[in-house]
């Protein structure tokens, strides 16, 4: 094992001084101070020595603190003013004549807190103008003795208060010493030879042959290095990006919609009855302003007919829901509860010519549910939803698309189970298998019912599916509480890696 020259110089310092423990100042007599820590870090990784850190808190007066040593803290300024002007008291409103604007409130508060004054009809009356202020005494001591370990527990509390008031600041100083371990002791028992070394060859060295005179230092990939945590995207953002890239690779294009939607687009167009529990205030965020929105009248009439009796004009689609549809309810605004509204609005925007072509779109965005926050529910979360519209697609195609999508996200084992959703028929749930957890439900899907598509003049089958990305993130990151995704835990954010599966 060949050591770096700086490592050798550091060990030679121990050899020549015949010491087992040395500090930074002592070692800097043998090797440049800026190189000591680097060499010591390398040697500690080789188990040659141990770096011992002794942390000390020291206090340092600020500019305000130094001024207060000469002029007094604000409370003392008030006392001195009264004393110098032979006054018995001073009106509170006159404090601004003595103190800076930002000192006035704090000075009055501290005078009362310390029990130095009484307030009589808006006047400040000192009980003793020659009082002793422990804060002033500690401030003076801090100007001479910086080491907090020399202060009593009560004095440290006063130091903390002086820090809050801006008179001083507290810094942490780290003193390091270096102790040889057995491997290092064994190494310095032998002569230490330091050769001139180089880390790279130049053309001149090669042409002249001088490279033979140097020792070329080999690279050691096993030497421990300091961990670096460069800026990176949040794990949730990485998962959103990954899902986006997977869907684009599968031939989908992304669409968007507004966060605030009318109930018409969010519920009515999906054949969800107006008395459905999902529309209750405990499940949906209703917008206070604007509390209504514009609804296209021609589509409203068609959707209304579908809801009431399952007809569009003279064409019978189904039985409908058999209730009186309220157009005023359709105009109410809500925070969207799903991203399916993006696909529905996209389908509604298609021209007659565009409806003849196959369509594959998806949306990844935030949705909102008025739910109590717990380990698996948040009022705001990301959802991904997609549709495929084509002449010859069927349930088997839907299953194939979902399996391909989930496998591209790293889930090899996928199974399909029957399910119910109000706007698709047939419907399914896709489950994925994870070691140690078993089968877990991940997404819902189905084929849009005719009641959803007919108002837009769409006759082709439309496959639809949706997945909660927070749920996906929990599975990928091994989390048991959805709230952990949004905590400001810097260590977790630094060290979390999204596996490239």
Swiss-Prot record:
PROSITE patterns: AA_TRNA_LIGASE_II. This is Phenylalanine--tRNA ligase alpha subunit. GO terms for cellular component: cytoplasm. It catalyses: tRNA(Phe) + L-phenylalanine + ATP = L-phenylalanyl-tRNA(Phe) + AMP + diphosphate + H(+). Its cofactor is Mg(2+). It comes from Methanococcus maripaludis (strain C5 / ATCC BAA-1333). Mg(2+) binds at residue 425. Keywords: Aminoacyl-tRNA synthetase, ATP-binding, Cytoplasm, Ligase, Magnesium, Metal-binding, Nucleotide-binding, Protein biosynthesis. Belongs to the class-II aminoacyl-tRNA synthetase family. Phe-tRNA synthetase alpha subunit type 2 subfamily. GO terms for biological process: phenylalanyl-tRNA aminoacylation. Its main location: cytoplasm. Its EC number is 6.1.1.20. L-phenylalanine binds at residues 340, 423, 448. InterPro entries: aa-tRNA-synth_II (IPR006195), aa-tRNA-synth_II/BPL/LPL (IPR045864), Phe-tRNA-synth_IIc_asu (IPR004529), Phe_tRNA_ligase_alpha_bac/arc (IPR022917), Phenylalanyl-tRNA_Synthase (IPR002319). It is an enzyme of class 6 (ligase).
């Amino acid at each position: 094992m060949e050591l770096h020259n700086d490592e050798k110089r550091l060990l030679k310092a121990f050899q020549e001084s015949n010491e087992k423990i040395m500090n930074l100042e002592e070692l800097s007599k043998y090797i440049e101070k800026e190189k000591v820590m680097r060499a010591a870090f390398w040697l500690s990784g080789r188990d040659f020595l141990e770096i011992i850190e002794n942390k000390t808190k020291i206090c340092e007066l600020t500019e305000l603190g130094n001024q207060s040593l000469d002029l007094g803290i604000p409370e003392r300024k008030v006392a001195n003013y009264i004393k110098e002007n032979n006054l018995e008291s001073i009106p509170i409103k006159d404090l601004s004549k003595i103190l800076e604007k930002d000192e006035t409130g704090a000075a009055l508060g501290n005078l009362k807190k310390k029990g130095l004054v009484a307030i009589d009809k808006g006047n400040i009356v000192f009980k003793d103008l020659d009082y002793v202020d422990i804060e002033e005494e500690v401030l003076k001591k801090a100007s001479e003795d910086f080491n907090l370990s020399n202060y009593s527990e009560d004095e440290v509390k006063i130091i903390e208060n002086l820090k809050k008031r801006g008179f001083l600041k507290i810094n942490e100083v780290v003193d390091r010493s270096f102790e040889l371990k057995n491997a290092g002791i064994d190494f310095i028992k032998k002569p230490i030879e330091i050769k001139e070394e180089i880390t790279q060859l130049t053309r001149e060295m090669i042409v002249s042959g001088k490279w033979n005179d140097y020792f070329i230092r080999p690279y050691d990939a096993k030497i421990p290095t300091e961990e670096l945590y460069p800026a990176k995207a949040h794990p949730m953002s990485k998962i959103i990006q990954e899902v986006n890239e997977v869907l684009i690779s599968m031939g989908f294009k992304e669409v968007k919609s507004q966060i605030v939607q009318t109930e018409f687009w969010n519920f009515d167009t999906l054949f969800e009855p107006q008395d459905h529990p999902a529309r209750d205030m405990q499940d949906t965020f209703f917008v206070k302003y604007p509390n209504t929105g514009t609804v296209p009248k021609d589509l409203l009439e068609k959707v209304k007919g579908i809801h009431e009796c399952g007809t569009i004009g003279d064409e019978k689609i189904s039985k409908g829901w058999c209730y009186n549809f309220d157009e005023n309810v359709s105009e109410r605004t809500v925070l969207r509860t799903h991203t399916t509204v993006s696909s529905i609005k996209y389908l509604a925007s298609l021209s007659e010519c565009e409806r003849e072509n196959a369509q594959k779109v998806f949306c990844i965005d935030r949705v909102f549910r008025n739910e109590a926050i717990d380990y698996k529910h948040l009022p705001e979360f990301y959802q991904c939803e997609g549709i495929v519209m084509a002449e010859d697609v069927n349930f088997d195609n839907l299953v194939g698309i979902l399996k391909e999508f989930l496998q591209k996200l790293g889930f090899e084992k996928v199974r399909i189970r029957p399910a119910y959703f109000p706007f698709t028929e047939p419907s399914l749930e896709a489950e994925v298998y994870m070691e140690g957890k078993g089968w877990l439900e991940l997404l819902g899907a189905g084929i849009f019912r005719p009641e959803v598509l007919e108002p837009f003049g769409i006759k082709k089958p439309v496959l639809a599916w949706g997945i909660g990305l927070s749920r996906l993130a929990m599975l990928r990151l091994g989390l048991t509480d959805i709230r952990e995704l949004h905590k400001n835990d810097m260590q977790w954010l630094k060290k979390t890696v999204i596996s490239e599966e």
